[in-house]
Amino acid sequence: MNVAGGGTGTTAGSAGNNNTLPMAQLADGWLELESDPGLFTLLLEDFGCHDVQVEEVYDLQKPIESPYGFIFLFRWIEERRARRKIVETTAEIFVKDEEAISSIFFAQQVVPNSCATHALLSVLLNCNENNLQLGETLSRLKAHTKGMSPENKGLAIGNTPELACAHNSHAMPQARRRLERTGAGVASCRFTGEAFHFVSFVPINGQLFELDGLKPYPMNHGCWEEHEDWTDKFRRVMAERLGIATGEQDIRFNLMAVVPDRRIAITHKLKMLRTNQAIVSGTLQKLLKADEQGERDEQQRPDTPNTLLEPSAFTARDLQSLLKNLDTEIAINEQHLADENDRRQMFKVDASRRTHNYDKFICTFLTMLAHQGVLGELVSQHLLPSKKISGQSAANRLNKQNSAAASTANSSAGATAGGAKSQQQQQQQQQPQQPQTPKNGKSPGKTPGRRRKGRNKCRKRK
């Protein structure tokens, strides 16, 4: 979730809901806020404007019912090429007439990190008071800054303690620590290299205005056509703006709409449906009684040409069907109202989680783990997974190398042993065989057959 606002000023005191903080601690001590519609809705309630809510817009082509204005959050990079294109385009539509500027609420952002509040005020304080109840704080600010220059209006916003306290009460603890770490002397988002910034788009006197507290003048995008709504003109401007901004594939932006509180419209519709339900139910009861009475009178009264009954506009069956439809509509709207109330409650739960400081809990928890002797093991298991994986990989590679070396050694040893054995067999085959000594110890003589053959030869000679 993007955080709006750039640099910081001097350290701010505890914001909360305490409106008695010293002015010296509020003027330059505004904190960064997230671009969350729930946060903005609760911030409007803290300003005293209870009939408004903020919704995030995901589809530009989807119609939005009765918006007061739009808030556009985009990435602010002064040196970016796309940024220069936007500046060159918008320089032609600056409104420099002092009388025209003083007739609208346009305030320059002179307090760092206050662009979220500036964007909301640019929408609310340019709306018709007959359609919107601003509350005491905003009504007083609007009356007090009437006719002021844009710079003085920005100073008036920064010097309003109710606004500063409400703004800072929705900041995360990290924003306060960042403010304390940087301190004064750091440039605001007007001069930072990269930050996220809010601007407002509102209809004023039949023309679409873009109000940016970091610009010297408001921007007039002109009138919309007679047959279209001002939101159609806004869609065309945003489509062109996003086409320029995303030229370098930078799509980090979001869009929010400031709309009437949906619960008010749902409650009004429920009241109307219940009134119609009571009317239809009463009419149905009267019709049923009239039918019963008519049947009894018909039985008692003689038929004459002068006794004519007016035909009813609705039959009992028609009224029963209408009553059933009303019951269904009431159930649907009651569910919508319950969903909106649950959503508003979740905004408060998320705000409590966002602004709560978990530092003490985390420190105490880690201290208890250290006393129990399990902190080191948890760190080695969860915080150093890459080292463990790399160590296991090295061990696996070493085991594979050892296995390969062992298999190579075994194969070479087997080959050496086989060669020696074959050489020994060859030597044994080349050596003459020694006669075997018999068991009785006597050397073997000639075979009896040879001796007999020799004797026969001698006898023949004689």
From Swiss-Prot:
Keywords: Chromatin regulator, Hydrolase, Nucleus, Protease, Thiol protease, Ubl conjugation pathway. GO terms for cellular component: chromatin; cytoplasm; PR-DUB complex. It comes from the Eukaryota. The record marks 212 as: Important for enzyme activity. It catalyses: Thiol-dependent hydrolysis of ester, thioester, amide, peptide and isopeptide bonds formed by the C-terminal Gly of ubiquitin (a 76-residue protein attached to proteins as an intracellular targeting signal). Residues 448-462 have a biased composition (Basic residues). It is an enzyme of class 3 (hydrolase). Residues 399-447 have a biased composition (Low complexity). Its EC number is 3.4.19.12. Catalytic component of the polycomb repressive deubiquitinase (PR-DUB) complex, a complex that specifically mediates deubiquitination of histone H2A monoubiquitinated at 'Lys-119' (H2AK118ub1). Mediates bisymmetric organization of the PR-DUB complex and is involved in association with nucleosomes to mediate deubiquitination. Does not deubiquitinate monoubiquitinated histone H2B. Required to maintain the transcriptionally repressive state of homeotic genes throughout development. The PR-DUB complex has weak or no activity toward 'Lys-48'- and 'Lys-63'-linked polyubiquitin chains. Catalytic component of the polycomb repressive deubiquitinase (PR-DUB) complex, at least composed of caly/calypso, Asx and sba (MBD5/6 homolog). The PR-DUB complex associates with nucleosomes to mediate deubiquitination of histone H2AK118ub1 substrates; the association requires the positively charged C-terminal tail of caly, probably due to direct binding of DNA. Interacts (via ULD domain) with Asx (via DEUBAD domain); the interaction produces a stable heterodimer with a composite binding site for ubiquitin. This is Ubiquitin carboxyl-terminal hydrolase calypso. It comes from Drosophila virilis. The gene is caly.
